[in-house]
Amino acid sequence: MDSFFSTYVLPAIIMIGQSLLLLVCLLVFIAYVLLADRKIWAAVQLRRGPNVVGPFGLFQSFADLLKFVFKEPIIPAGANKAVFLLAPLVTVLLALSTWAVVPLADGWVIANINVGILYIFAISSLEVYGIIMGGWASNSKYPFLGALRSAAQMVSYEVSIGFVIVTVLLCVGSLNLTDIVNAQHTGLGTMLGLPASFLDWHWLSLFPMFIIFFISALAETNRPPFDLPEAESELVAGFMVEYGSSPYMMFMLGEYAAVCLMCSLTTILFLGGWLPPVDIWILNWVPGIIWFMLKACFVFFMFAMVKAFVPRYRYDQLMRLGWKVFLPLSLAMVIIVAFVLKLMGWA
């Protein structure tokens, strides 16, 4: 009995506790990411942004949460009620479940599986089903058009993201996210005789793929300038136009969880994860999770700057960029990286 408890029950309890702790921390972080997005957007427009609830508006997201929770959900008369309510739940659960394999620091991961990046790629591909369900079940033309746009957009840019992952796999030889970070201890900088630093991270050696992944991440998460599925000037609010109260909040939560995931993946694949910018003793004292958070916040800041300065693409421009530019370019980079690795004997 004792062996059964120590072998099965105790690890399950520990994993559930870790999952709940990660979930709470993630939800709080998403609340402040949403606040930061609004603050940055306001600063660009020379406004103050949310500044009433709490000091400097720090509790604004929690006030919005309470507002949504206490509102009555309204279901359109011709909507499929079950699918209409299930759609936001599917979206948010899939978005949150991907975080189980994301290492926030060395050893700070719930499930350190050897196909971590493949797991994230598979689960994030399923998130479009929640959007399609919501658009179809609303029984309205604007949500349905937004859902169709989202499906086409995500399929188009997932191909490029897949080729980016292949290039990283060729360089590292593993799909484990922890191994990908540890492989960036050495790289282009150490080959030139320099100490371990940010020059060893993949952003420099795989710079074209870094740019492709960054832009594809914007399209994958429906962020501007690729927010065609919820373009306010064309589709009002897109697939969310018939949603309000808690279901709308769950859609927004799933969207920002996916944004945070893409920022974290960019950090892991190209910015060295939890590694310090320079391998010196004073920077090594800083906990790895601090470096990870700083890098992820920097990537999100770049996401917000793109939203502020780049106008929305037309739908034909969006498709052309994905299929005629990123797809052949990423495929060519896979061939070039494989050729260089084989030529130099690093494969």
Curated annotation (Swiss-Prot):
Principal subcellular localisation of the protein: membrane
An example Gene Ontology CC term for this record: plasma membrane
Transmembrane residue ranges: 13-33, 50-70, 82-102, 115-135, 161-181, 198-218, 263-283, 286-306, 321-341
InterPro entries: NADH_UbQ_OxRdtase_su1/FPO, NADH_UbQ_OxRdtase_su1_CS
GO molecular function: NADH dehydrogenase activity; oxidoreductase activity, acting on NAD(P)H, quinone or similar compound as acceptor; quinone binding
EC number, as in UniProt: 7.1.1.-
Cellular compartment(s): Cell inner membrane
Alphabetized UniProt keyword annotations: Cell inner membrane, Cell membrane, Membrane, NAD, Quinone, Translocase, Transmembrane, Transmembrane helix, Ubiquinone
GO biological process, one term: aerobic respiration
Any Pfam family: NADHdh
Root EC class: translocase
Topology with respect to the bilayer: Multi-pass membrane protein
Reactions the enzyme catalyzes: a quinone + NADH + 5 H(+)(in) = a quinol + NAD(+) + 4 H(+)(out)
Role played: NDH-1 shuttles electrons from NADH, via FMN and iron-sulfur (Fe-S) centers, to quinones in the respiratory chain. The immediate electron acceptor for the enzyme in this species is believed to be ubiquinone. Couples the redox reaction to proton translocation (for every two electrons transferred, four hydrogen ions are translocated across the cytoplasmic membrane), and thus conserves the redox energy in a proton gradient. This subunit may bind ubiquinone.
HAMAP family assigned: NDH1_NuoH
PANTHER family: NADH DEHYDROGENASE SUBUNIT 1, NADH-UBIQUINONE OXIDOREDUCTASE CHAIN 1
Subunit field text: NDH-1 is composed of 14 different subunits. Subunits NuoA, H, J, K, L, M, N constitute the membrane sector of the complex.
Family to which the UniProt record says this protein belongs: Belongs to the complex I subunit 1 family.
Name under which the protein is recorded: NADH-quinone oxidoreductase subunit H
Lineage of the organism: Bacteria, Pseudomonadati, Pseudomonadota, Alphaproteobacteria, Hyphomicrobiales
